[in-house]
Amino acid sequence: MLQMPKLNEIPPGRAGRREARGEGRWPGQTGPEAARLEWRAQGQAGGARAPWDSWGSSRLPTQPGPGWSRCPPSLLCALSFQKSTMESKDEVSDTDSGIILQSGPDSPVSPMKELTHAVHKQQRALEARLEACLEELRRLCLREAELTGTLPAEYPLKPGEKAPKVRRRIGAAYKLDDWALHREDPLSSLERQLALQLQITEAARRLCLEENLSRQARRQRKHSMLQEEKKLQELQRCLVERRRNSEPPPAAALPLGRELSASDDSSLSDGLLLEEEESQVPKPPPESPAPPSRPLPPQTLEGLQPTGPEAGSPERAPVQNSPWKETSLDHPYEKPRKSSEPWSESSSPATTPQDGPSASSLWLLEPASYHVVPIRGVPGQWQGRTSAPATPEIQGRRGQSQSLRVDSFRAGPEGRGRSAFPRRRPTHYTVTVPDSCFPATKPPLPHAACHSCSEDSGSDVSSISHPTSPGSSSPDISFLQPLSPPKTHRHRGAWVPAGSRELVAHHPKLLLPPGYFPAGRYVVVAESPLPPGEWELRRAAPGPAYEEEGTPLRYQRLVPSRSRIVRTPSLKDSPAGRGLSKAAVSEELKWWHERARLRSTRPHSLDRQGAFRVRSLPLGREGFGRALGPRAQVPTVCVLRRSPDGAPVQVFVPEKGEIISQV
């Protein structure tokens, strides 16, 4: 007998599946009754029965129904994941739900979409920039059309757009002034043309010097080069004339480059020779271009007043602020110019008589027959140096040098004040002039020459060159040869006919009282950083040289600091120089080259130490030996009696109150 299952029992094959699905039921409801209640509840809610609620099918439909959208997403993902794990754990299916679940760089569609999006974004940015540029172009074209009355062809038109009509603004028509266009400096225009022509000429010269050219081409290039050179010379000439015709610069602003350098033919004699005149009375000076605040100095001793600081006046500026004016004496090759420069205050010596020798004008004795006049110094000589030696000066021309002119300063050291710069070292200038410069109180001595010395690596002197530094092995040569007695000339600027001897200097301390100028060689002592107004004249102190007749007197001489010497005048200026023998010229040239060779090996490291220099001399030439000591220790001496040959026999020393006689 067959057994039928009970209604409230679950078939044995379905119980495990219901438990596996884990669907909750109300307690007490089992079997078909529970299924019917669940179906009825879903139908009353208005929803269709879900496909997976059927007992016979557990597969998801290929096409979801109306109830699929209301299904919770968690349930959908759980079902999809459950099936994928059953089919393959390593592969994710994209056919269950019809939605691509893959994303990121592994997806074959995503990089292309991203690239397309970036390109579209860049295109939109470029289009916006192009539109802005076109708008700016339209605005500029409209402004131009308002000025000219015509719309430019560059005006951008949109598709189907017509060109706008623009009317010119009132007052927009005008003409530019030619003067406003060409009001630039003509000098600058000429300079630019000259610079361009220099380059063109250089290019033409290089083309002419090229190799492997035919005769015709070489001739043409040479002709072109000559034409360009002519144009260059014409431009240079026009530029020089234009500069000359332009407004002249003030006298105080002369270019210093020319004053700070000396050429190879520089020598001290350019500043030594004074212009000769038939009469002793100088001509009245013409109108001076100097400012009216600088009065001209008087030309006679009677009109001169002692220069010094005024009472209650503030201290003046240092000496370096006073300008130096070029004079006609600096151009010996030119004819005397009728200008006020030689007699202006900046170039004329300021002299003042004194009653007697002061403490700063100490005269040191030496048994020689020469007088001294200080050397003319040039402001800026402590700045400029050159390396070439100077041309030697012929002795015949030196014998006719009557005096040296010292560059003047407008006030002495008391009025000008001490320089703010530290002193480097004292400087000695040894100068000798013939007796023809002085009144004929006694017959002129036969050995008269003009010698000077300075320390300059490029501007040498006429007779005495560089001394050697302490520790230097290179001696320096100094020479002095006797000459024939020069003719007596009267020169302006050296000695005035006022009954007293006037030293051509710029400071009252350099003057001597009437009748007090004993014949002999003197040493000009100067501080290099100081103006020439603070120079002092000294004579060498008596020493062991008086014990022997043949022993030359030693001099105290310190190295000058960068003295600037000007050119040597031509031999054609000196009538006596034309008859010089070739032997004399060769001798001078030989000693000049010897000095240049020795100076090239001399170390310059001791130039700033104020060291005393010792010089060795050849036979037959006068020389200067070792310094006797600081100038503060040199006593003042007076010659009481001389021998017939001019040597001092009896000397009085005021400091010690002694009379020294030579036996």
Curated annotation (Swiss-Prot):
A motif (Nuclear localization signal (NLS) 3) lies at residues 422-428. Residues 282-298 have a biased composition (Pro residues). It comes from the Eukaryota. The keyword Nucleus applies. A motif (Nuclear localization signal (NLS) 2) lies at residues 332-338. Highly expressed in intestinal myeloid-derived cells and expressed in monocyte-derived macrophages upon induction by PRR activation. Induction: Expression is induced by the component of peptidoglycan muramyl dipeptide. Negatively regulated by microRNA-24 (miR-24). A motif (Nuclear localization signal (NLS) 1) lies at residues 164-170. Pfam families: CUPID. Residues 40-50, 259-272, 455-475 have a biased composition (Low complexity). GO terms for biological process: adherens junction maintenance; innate immune response; intestinal epithelial structure maintenance; nucleotide-binding oligomerization domain containing 2 signaling pathway; pattern recognition receptor signaling pathway; positive regulation of canonical NF-kappaB signal transduction; positive regulation of cytokine production involved in immune response; positive regulation of interleukin-1 beta production. Residues 350-361 have a biased composition (Polar residues). Residues 327-340 have a biased composition (Basic and acidic residues). Residues 1-68, 242-362, 378-425, 444-493 are annotated as: Disordered. GO terms for cellular component: cytoplasm; nuclear body; nucleoplasm; nucleus. It is found in: Nucleus; Cytoplasm. The keyword Nucleus applies. Residues 118-147 form a coiled coil. Keywords: Coiled coil, Cytoplasm, Disease variant, Immunity, Innate immunity, Nucleus. Changing residue 333 to F: In IBD29; decreases protein stability. Expressed in peripheral macrophages and intestinal myeloid-derived cells, is required for optimal PRR (pattern recognition receptor)-induced signaling, cytokine secretion, and bacterial clearance. Upon stimulation of a broad range of PRRs (pattern recognition receptor) such as NOD2 or TLR2, TLR3, TLR4, TLR5, TLR7 and TLR9, associates with YWHAQ/14-3-3T, which in turn leads to the recruitment and activation of MAP kinases and NF-kappa-B signaling complexes that amplifies PRR-induced downstream signals and cytokine secretion. It is linked to Inflammatory bowel disease 29: A chronic, relapsing inflammation of the gastrointestinal tract with a complex etiology. It is subdivided into Crohn disease and ulcerative colitis phenotypes. Crohn disease may affect any part of the gastrointestinal tract from the mouth to the anus, but most frequently it involves the terminal ileum and colon. Bowel inflammation is transmural and discontinuous; it may contain granulomas or be associated with intestinal or perianal fistulas. PANTHER family: COILED-COIL DOMAIN-CONTAINING PROTEIN 120 FAMILY MEMBER, INNATE IMMUNITY ACTIVATOR PROTEIN. Interacts with IRAK1, NOD2 and RIPK2; the interaction takes place upon PRR stimulation. Interacts with YWHAQ/14-3-3T; the interaction increases upon PRR stimulation and is required for cellular signaling pathway activation and cytokine secretion. Interacts (via N-terminal domain) with CYTH1 and CYTH2 (via their N-terminal domains). Interacts with FBXW11 and BTRC; associates with SCF E3 ubiquitin-protein ligase complexes. This is Innate immunity activator protein. The lineage of its organism: Eukaryota, Metazoa, Chordata, Craniata, Vertebrata. The gene is INAVA.
